């Protein structure tokens, strides 16, 4: 068995990931809140649509491994970023709000995209995952469950990145208007429950107030912890929608990496490992996710994205409006009830 395409592919991916990580830590990237994940997929797409086809057979096995196994490992290790103690810091209000926003946003996106915009179901589910939970990371986590092609994943990531970035500029303006309705703590929950990416949530909070920032990040991480049950629900929905009756012996596909993700988060909650080791796991996790994004970019053809048309972005802006307006109404209502 020729293993050279496997190892050469991993080395090639590692080089792109290292470059993306370096660029993601520059002052320019920090100022404009451009993460290494986004840089990795852009670099991957740039190479994938120019010189990569000339030597793809020499590295393809390693690239596909990075896109699959490294992604799943990265999602599992993501659990080291979370503890269940975080929930106590923001209270039941945030948990209920996050759950309502996750469910309502996903089904809003699915209904709008499939029934009214007549879009590809896989693309809609990926976009819904990204808008409902944690942006690009959720899209990547949903990819093995939906079994979507690379270009669909890239389109979904583009949608959540564009409108999540827009949120960085609009939410601080909205805070000024809403101060007479909700306090800083409640606005932090609103940000954490409705903005796409963790980095975007942090950026918004830092631009407003320390209380908003701390509450928003914790609220967002609670939303991230809902990734595993969401993937199980998505797997069940896909099985049912594919025409599997309750009387058949067909088994629902369980995304075990999602279950392990929760297991790691539970383990991390007991604070058994030295903080330096946990920090190392988080750094390894970041590199694995950056690597898988680079592999995703390499296997994405620009022509396939162009073929998707404007509908994904129409879906993105309508979902964004739901997150901003509907999200505020949900947060305001919950704050009065709990």
UniProtKB/Swiss-Prot annotation:
One Pfam family from the record: Cons_hypoth698
Family of the protein in this entry: Belongs to the UPF0324 family.
Recorded topology in the membrane: Multi-pass membrane protein
Broad class of the protein's primary localization: membrane
Keywords of the record: Cell membrane, Membrane, Transmembrane, Transmembrane helix
Highest classification ranks of the organism: Bacteria, Pseudomonadati, Pseudomonadota, Betaproteobacteria, Neisseriales
TM annotation in the entry: 5-23, 33-55, 62-84, 94-116, 123-145, 155-177, 222-239, 254-273, 280-302, 312-334
Domain of life per record: Bacteria
Subcellular location: Cell membrane
InterPro entries xref list: UPF0324_pro (IPR018383), UPF0324_YeiH-like (IPR004630)
Species this protein is from: Neisseria meningitidis serogroup B (strain ATCC BAA-335 / MC58)
A GO cellular-component term linked to this record: plasma membrane
UniProt protein name: UPF0324 membrane protein NMB1979
């Amino acid at each position: 068995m020729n293993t050279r395409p496997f190892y050469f592919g991993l080395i090639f991916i590692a080089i792109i990931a290292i470059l993306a990580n370096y660029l993601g830590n520059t002052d320019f990237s920090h100022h404009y809140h451009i993460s290494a994940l986004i840089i990795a997929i852009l670099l991957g797409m740039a190479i994938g649509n120019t010189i990569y086809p000339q030597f793809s057979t020499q590295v393809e096995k390693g690239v596909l491994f990075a896109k699959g196994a490294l992604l799943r490992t990265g999602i599992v290790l993501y659990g080291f970023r979370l503890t269940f103690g975080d929930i106590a810091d923001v209270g039941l209000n945030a948990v209920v709000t996050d759950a309502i926003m996750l469910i309502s946003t996903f089904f809003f996106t699915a209904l709008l995209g499939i029934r009214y915009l007549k879009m590809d179901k896989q693309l809609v589910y990926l976009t819904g995952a990204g808008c409902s939970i944690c942006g690009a990371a959720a899209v990547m986590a949903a990819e093995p469950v939906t079994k979507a092609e690379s270009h669909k994943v890239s389109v979904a990531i583009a949608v959540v990145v564009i409108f999540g970035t827009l949120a960085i500029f609009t939410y601080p303006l909205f805070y000024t208007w809403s101060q007479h309705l909700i306090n800083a703590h409640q606005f932090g929950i609103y940000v954490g429950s409705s903005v796409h990416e963790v980095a975007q949530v942090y950026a918004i909070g830092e631009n407003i107030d320390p209380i908003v920032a701390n509450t928003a990040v914790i609220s967002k991480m609670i939303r991230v912890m809902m990734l595993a049950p969401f993937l199980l629900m998505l797997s069940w929905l896909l099985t049912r929608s594919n025409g599997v009756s309750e009387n058949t012996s067909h088994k629902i596909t369980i995304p075990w990496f999602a279950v392990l993700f929760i297991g790691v988060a539970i383990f991390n909650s007991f604070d058994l490992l030295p903080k330096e080791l946990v920090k190392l796991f988080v750094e390894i996790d970041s590199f694995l996710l950056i690597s898988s994004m680079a592999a995703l970019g390499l296997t994405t053809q620009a022509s396939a994205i162009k073929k998707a048309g404007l509908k994904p972005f129409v879906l993105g802006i309508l979902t964004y409006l739901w997150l901003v307006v509907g999200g505020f109404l949900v947060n305001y209502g919950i704050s009065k009830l709990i």
